[in-house]
Amino acid sequence: MVSTFSRKNQNYKKDDLNQPSKDGRFGKYGGQYVPETLMPALFELETAASNAWKDKLFVKELNHLLKTYVGRETPLYEAKRLTEYYKTKKAIPKIWLKREDLNHTGAHKINNALGQALLAIRMGKKRIIAETGAGQHGVATATVCARFGLKCIIYMGAEDIKRQSLNVFRMKLLGAEVKVVNSGTATLKDATSEAIRDWVSNVESTHYILGSVAGPHPFPKIVRDFHAVIGEETKKQCLESFGSLPDILLACVGGGSNAMGLFHPFVKETSVRLIGVEAAGGGVDTDKHAATITKGSVGILHGSMSLLLQDDNGQVQEAHSISAGLDYPGVGPEHSHLKDIGRAEYGSVTDQEALDSLRLVSELEGIIPALETSHAFAWLDKLCPTLEKDTHIVINCSGRGDKDVNTVASSLDI
């Protein structure tokens, strides 16, 4: 069940919404828990990013490439048949989709990969590494490396390679070297760990294009800021389409980059509800889920303090989701902070609920969403019956489902 929204749960001050702090903290979360070897690289990256955003030529080049190469701005689409499906006697949920699935490479990931590639060039780094789970960040990184002539190495868990063979081929076709990670659970967590080990060993020549709003400062801020174009466009498009800000923003959350990209320009617009949806896998009361915010506790993973799935001894537990992109036992520190202060709400849906929603959206709107995105759509089943009035809901359609066809075909009786 979804709890009825109440502003009594909000306990933040103005400064709580102006994050991170100078030392890279979102409240008590974030920070830099890394080997000394990486501290100069993190400082260099923070300085490069700060200077880049002040450089009109950098911003002009980024915006030009977002338009001509990525295909921005992406449409805000009115999902009329979904609206009809979810309307009740009390309320009509007017559902809008922010179509990040229409970006070049098929997801939101290209926004950040492009921006960080430009930063790497500014820093003189010609070797790029990245981690990937669903393969979309890997494809986006391989794409921008091909565009700029940069050497590209992608770390990917063996389990995810089985689930995402199409994206593995795409990365190789784009000229990237895909390194298989067999350690641990052979999923996104382990791929990230291997990428960090590579970076420690090759820090002088290499830039790590981290794919989510996780990791040590300044990565959560850098990734968020490159994805904020999603929310900035959404704000403008909502005013153009229906003359007001949306009532609710809805996005799936693994590490949390697509959600933060949508949420960030609205964080100080406190009339707008922000809802993130995690992967409940086989159920949050089982040991097979990735609902970090729902069930996690404070710990340190991949250089950052945040909420984690861990046992009583602080050992990181295995996450599970049918969606490779949500199959991660941590979450970005800003999400943990927004949850703590009550500015954002978080729930979870199971594998089966996500599959059912993928099929529903496909049949009603002619749009096949990614399994990750389908978790956000599935939350409509829980949210819409609670609405007391007509409500504008914007869902971040973070990626398309082409990559998931084999997984879905084996799970749905079609």
Curated annotation (Swiss-Prot):
GO terms for molecular function: tryptophan synthase activity. Its cofactor is pyridoxal 5'-phosphate. It catalyses: (1S,2R)-1-C-(indol-3-yl)glycerol 3-phosphate + L-serine = D-glyceraldehyde 3-phosphate + L-tryptophan + H2O. Residues 1-26 are annotated as: Disordered. Residues 12-26 have a biased composition (Basic and acidic residues). Pfam families: PALP. GO terms for cellular component: cytoplasm. Its EC number is 4.2.1.20. The modification N6-(pyridoxal phosphate)lysine is found at residue 109. Pathway: Amino-acid biosynthesis; L-tryptophan biosynthesis; L-tryptophan from chorismate: step 5/5. Keywords: Amino-acid biosynthesis, Aromatic amino acid biosynthesis, Lyase, Pyridoxal phosphate, Tryptophan biosynthesis. InterPro entries: Trp_synth_b_CS, Trp_synth_beta, Trp_synth_beta/beta-like, TrpB-like_PALP, TrpB-like_PALP_sf. Tetramer of two alpha and two beta chains. NCBIfam families: trpB. Belongs to the TrpB family. The beta subunit is responsible for the synthesis of L-tryptophan from indole and L-serine. This is Tryptophan synthase beta chain. The lineage of its organism: Bacteria, Bacillati, Cyanobacteriota, Cyanophyceae, Synechococcales. The gene is trpB.
